[in-house]
Amino acid sequence: GGVVKEAEDVIATLEVRKEAQKYPAELIPVRLSEIYLINEGYEWVVSTVKQELKKDFQGIEEDLEKLQQVIDSGKIGSKKKEEWLAIGITVCAILANEVDGMEWKTLIDGNRETPVLQYKDRTIDPMKLVWSKVKAGEPCNVIEEYKKCLD
């Protein structure tokens, strides 16, 4: 035990979040649950590329071409949100492997708690990289999206 007064002062500053109130999005250090999502999504892409193209996937920039071939084959239905999210996560994983300073974070915005990449003052959301486009009926080019993240 330390000083009770100090603990009471800290506790007095805490605020219980209200149901109907909107809070600003927060970026916190990546948590284990998001690391699990990153690994699960990446492993799904590795096995899908191996299954569909009979090629290895190493998580490097050159692998984006293989990922695009799987997308272009039409094997992933436009309603398969989790699979598209896995592709977005994999593009981010390649960015994290290839670019110094890219760092995984957990985004908490009231609607979801999800892994995102932070680079300098930018946040790269794997869901917005591909799923948002697919959902809107737009074509998905992972090589272009990857290059946009480098600008």
Where are these regions (language model features)?
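Acidic, serine/threonine-rich, charge-biased low-complexity segments
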Residues: 1, 50, 83, 141-142, ...
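Charged, structured surface patches that assemble and position nucleic-acid processing machinery
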Residues: 1-14
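Short, well-ordered coil loops that connect the C-terminus of an alpha-helix to the N-terminus
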Residues: 2, 55, 101-102
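Amphipathic, interaction-prone secondary-structure segments
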Residues: 73-120
